[in-house]
Amino acid sequence: MEQVKIGFLGAGNMGSAIMRGIAGSKLSEQVALYAYDHMPEKTAALAEIGVTACASEAEIVKQCKYVFLAIKPQQFEATLPKLADGITEDTVIVSIAAGMTPDYIRSQTKPNAKVI
């Protein structure tokens, strides 16, 4: 069975906590975790649990079917347009940021994007 690829934009408190939870669970064998953070030392610290660091936001979207937006709301405007070209009909975007609606995320990426 092929591993499900899950990517995280942001490896701060929330993003890293979710990644550590997945890595420490029964799901860990079924999932490949990827992360990008503008502070590379944050993704480097997650290598010990098997997280693959990506070089850019766009790389996360290219690599992963599921993309968690674990960034601060004020970072959305600059970050979301960088994702648009890589989003396909199979991509699922999961936002954990307060106040960011699916409609706003679609308006900054692709109108038909799957957003939770």
Where would I find each of the regions flagged by the language model?
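Rossmann-like NAD(P)(H) cofactor-binding subdomain of soluble oxidoreductases
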Residues: E57-L69, P73-I116
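NAD(P)+-binding Rossmann beta1-loop-alpha1 motif at the extreme N-terminus of oxidoreductases
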Residues: M1-K62
